[in-house]
Amino acid sequence: FDRDTLLPKIKILFEKLKYGGINDIKIVNPSWQEGVSKNITFIVTKDCQLACKYCYLVGKNEKERMPWETAKAAIDYVLDREDDPNFAYESVIWDFIGGEPFLEIDLIDKICDYIKTEMYRRNHHWFNSYRFSFSTNGINYDSEKVQKFIKKNHEHLSIGITIDGTARKHDLNRVYKNSERGSYKDVVR
């Protein structure tokens, strides 16, 4: 059917329903939010080992990092609003990006411990329905601290490692700071 044919038929149907005694017609659709998670994003640092040629981050490779007090205040703000419709989601994804987030693994570990403790203490409905998500260049993935964090949180963890395709393609854009050396071999090791 085209629009010109269908629209008059729909109007006739609604008129028949209305005159048949149905005055409150509602089209019921399942909520688009059903099964959707609330995303809370922490930019824990602007620092990175790389100087990717297409990086979107303004002021990239600055040593700026998120203070613990800022992270704690943000967590408290979010968890205090459990009854707010803007936070009425079945689950939550606590997302960590940068720069390179794993450069701040100690801060991230402290943030995640606080989130888990507070959700438990408050009996928050997200306590058994959360994930920690990371977008990383993968260079620090094998570090002892990162691996310890992964083991501790593995049941609630998603990690995306950015690779641009083949080694040649990756190394064209994803180079170390102050160098043209590509990072592919360090990521896939």
Each model region followed by its residue ranges:
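Acidic metal-phosphate-binding loop of nucleotide-sugar-dependent transferases
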Residues: 59, 100-101, 138-139
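Radical SAM/AdoMet-radical enzyme domain recognition
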Residues: 79-95, 104-189
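Pocket-edge positions in alpha/beta enzyme catalytic cores
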Residues: 63-66, 100, 178-179
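Canonical Radical SAM [4Fe-4S] cluster-binding loop centered on the CxxxCxxC motif
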Residues: 34-35, 39-70
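Short loop/turn segments at strand-loop or loop-helix junctions that form parts
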Residues: 44, 56-57, 99, 161-166
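Hydrophobic core segments within long, regular secondary-structure runs in both alpha-
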Residues: 72-75, 112
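N-terminal [4Fe-4S]-dependent radical SAM core
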Residues: 2-41, 85-88
